[in-house]
UniProtKB/Swiss-Prot annotation:
Belongs to the UPF0161 family. Its main location: membrane. It is found in: Cell membrane. This is Putative membrane protein insertion efficiency factor. It comes from Chloroflexus aggregans (strain MD-66 / DSM 9485). Keywords: Cell membrane, Membrane. It is a peripheral membrane protein. It holds the Pfam family YidD. The keyword Membrane applies.
Length: 70
């Protein structure tokens, strides 16, 4: 249930909010795609924690680049 809710929230962000904001993620795949994949693969708790850590790393002073879900 929590997994389903988090995936729906991420999808809502991707469809309704993200198109209206300038691109700012320095990673590939983007943080929202990373979060969706991580939660799908590892579940709400572990995937959610991985997503939080990824978003915390996404700032202008980071290297960025290719960073897939392990």
């Amino acid at each position: 249930m929590l997994r389903w809710l988090l995936l729906k929230l991420i999808r809502f962000y991707q469809v309704a909010i993200s198109p209206w904001t300038p691109p700012s993620c320095i990673y590939t795949p983007t943080c929202s795609h990373y979060g969706y994949e991580a939660i799908q693969k590892y579940g709400a708790l572990r995937g959610g924690w991985m997503t939080i850590k990824r978003i915390a790393r996404c700032h202008p002073f980071a290297r960025g680049g290719y960073d897939p879900v392990p």
